Each structure stands twice: as structure tokens, then as C-alpha cells.
């Protein structure tokens, strides 16, 4: 499935701007990570873009109830499977770098954006791993984010958490304008 088809599918099932921005953020980070794991940039991007496409319509059944829609739309089986693995509640083991990366960056991308949004400049490029770690200790900040999952995702992917935060910041900086953020740090 190409990106245009994936975007159309996302927009058909996801109407809220917030969830579309989340999809764009995860797509950006997945595209950034793909070459490091010998993954296809387009494929990894499509998986990131579609991973929550069914959440708005069926949060309780997500992501398993979206599976037939993805299959009918022509998404390859291993990519559908990767999307299924990003939900802990299903208990599907994550085995491939694609599956592990999706899990690792799903909540992290949103958390990094939340950290950027509370900065006076709203510049995602200024977010440092230390700032993310500090906000992780504040249980009232971005309350729904599972802190343990942030750390576990990086560990399962085989990277240091701070390095994954840096990669996430770099990737999000490239799409900051589409996310309602400032991109680069001032010169």
C-alpha cells in the first residue's frame, strides 16, 4: 500500500485532528528509524501512519477489529500483524524490528510532543532526553502515558532510551509544522 492510499484510509476512519497528528508523528519517527534496521522507509511510514486508524471508531476493539479493514484495503499481512502487536492488551509478541519500533515510538512520540508543547518556544528540537525523563517522573503530566512502556519499548528495540528520544526529536522536527509545533532551534 502506498502512502497516499494509507492517508486516505486514515482520513476515512479518523476525523479528529489530534489523532491524525499522532499518526503523522508516529509515521515520521518510523520513517526516520527504518534505515537503521534495514527497513523500507515507505513501508515503515505506512505502518506508523495506520497503526491507530481504527481507534476513534472503536477504541475498545482497537487494533484487532481494524484488521479486516486493513486486509480488505490491501495492506500486506506482515504489516497488519505489526499493527496488531503495538497493543499490549492483545499479548501478541513483538519479534521484528518493525514491530518493536512501532511499539517503542507510539507513546514516546506523543510524550515528546507534550514536552515540547509546555515549553515557551514550543520547539520540539529543543526537547532533551533529560527534560523527557524529568516529565516522566511527574505522574500528573501526560497522565495516560505508561512510563514503563516508554522504557520497555526502547529496551526491546535494543537502544538506549535517551538515544531513542533524540531520534524521536529529530524525526518530529522534520514535521513540526504539521503537528502545530516549532521545528528547529533558533540559530
Predicted region positions:
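Active-site oxyanion-binding pockets that recognize sulfate/phosphate
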Residues: 12-16, 98, 158
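Divalent metal-dependent catalytic cores for phosphoryl transfer on phosphate-bearing substrates
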Residues: 37-142, 151
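Active-site hotspot residues in diverse enzymes, especially metal/ion-binding acidic/histidine motifs
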Residues: 24, 28-33, 42, 160-174, ...
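Predominant activation on well-ordered alpha-helical scaffold segments within soluble catalytic domains
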Residues: 7, 11, 24-27, 31, ...
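C-terminal binding/interaction regions
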Residues: 124, 130-183
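Acidic/His-rich, divalent-metal-binding segments that scaffold phosphate/diphosphate chemistry
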Residues: 1-58
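Conserved active-site and cofactor/substrate-binding residues in soluble primary-metabolism enzymes
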Residues: 1, 5, 21-25, 61, ...
Amino acid at each position: 500500500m502506498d502512502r497516499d492510499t494509507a492517508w486516505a484510509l486514515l482520513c476515512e476512519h479518523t476525523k479528529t485532528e489530534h489523532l491524525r497528528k499522532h499518526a503523522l508523528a508516529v509515521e515520521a519517527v518510523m520513517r526516520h528509524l527504518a534505515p537503521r534496521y534495514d527497513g523500507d522507509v515507505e513501508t515503515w511510514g505506512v505502518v506508523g501512519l495506520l497503526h491507530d486508524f481504527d481507534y476513534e471508531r472503536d477504541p475498545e476493539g482497537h487494533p484487532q477489529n481494524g484488521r479486516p479493514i486493513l486486509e480488505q484495503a490491501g495492506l500486506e499481512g506482515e504489516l497488519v500483524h505489526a499493527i496488531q502487536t503495538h497493543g499490549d492488551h492483545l499479548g501478541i509478541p513483538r519479534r521484528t524490528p518493525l514491530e518493536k519500533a512501532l511499539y517503542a515510538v507510539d507513546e514516546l512520540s506523543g510524550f515528546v510532543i507534550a514536552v515540547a508543547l509546555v515549553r515557551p518556544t514550543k520547539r520540539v528540537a529543543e526537547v532533551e532526553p533529560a527534560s523527557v525523563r524529568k516529565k516522566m517522573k511527574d505522574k500528573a503530566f501526560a497522565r495516560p502515558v505508561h512510563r514503563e512502556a516508554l522504557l520497555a519499548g526502547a529496551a526491546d528495540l535494543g537502544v538506549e532510551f535517551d538515544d531513542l528520544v533524540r531520534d524521536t526529536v529529530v524525526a518530529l522536527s522534520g514535521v513540526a509544522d504539521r503537528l502545530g509545533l516549532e521545528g528547529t532551534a533558533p540559530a
